[in-house]
A protein has these predicted regions:
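Charge-rich (acidic/polar
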Residues: 2-183
Length: 183
């Protein structure tokens, strides 16, 4: 029998070579850079309910697709950097704890106590990370006008009523459809 043909073949096959088994390379990079990964976006509920993300606004401004005043831009940049610096610290802690668990599992030195402590701490850290990202989106509402928020949401493709029918420019269609539960 060939691997993958068994009734117990694993969707994790191939991931056993990861540096940290619980995290993909993209997840690790995102955590260490302060991005809103993993889990498909730490601020996804805010984003999909019309609360702009500072990184996306700044990207749209840089691309000439969106206008903000100089004062708004400075506030958005400051907000983004504050969020990013907090997220990096939390992300580094998550990666460190996940590494400890992975190493202990690999060396067969894991204890229930270490496992419990690290996993519970990782859970709390992910909660803090989500909060940092979500609060940042909420703070954007104090910086942007209602018209700007409406324009942002149109640029992001959140106005069709059916996100599966309106994939925003620059978004990979497969990833967009996956994140929006399109069939």
């Amino acid at each position: 029998m060939v691997a993958g043909e068994s009734v117990i073949s694993s969707p994790y096959a191939g991931q056993e070579t990861r540096e940290i088994k619980a995290l993909s390379t993209k997840d690790i990079e995102g955590l260490l850079s302060g991005a809103g990964t993993p889990y498909g976006g730490m601020a996804k509920p805010a984003e999909l309910n019309g609360y702009p993300g500072p990184r996306h606004v700044l990207d749209a401004v840089s691309a000439g697709e969106f206008e903000v005043t100089l004062e708004q831009r400075e506030k958005i940049e400051s907000l983004f950097e504050s969020m990013r610096s907090q997220a990096i610290v939390i992300g580094e802690e998550i990666v460190e704890l996940e590494t400890e668990v992975d190493v202990a599992l690999a060396m067969r030195t894991i204890t229930t106590e270490l496992l419990r402590e690290n996993i519970l701490e990782v859970g709390q850290l992910y909660g803090r990370l989500r909060l940092v990202h979500l609060e940042t989106h909420l703070s954007m509402m104090d910086i942007m006008t209602e018209d700007q928020v409406d324009r942002y949401n149109r640029l992001r493709g959140y106005t069709s009523g059916n996100p599966c029918d309106n994939i925003p420019k620059g978004h990979p269609p497969e990833m967009w459809k996956k994140h929006n539960n399109c069939s």
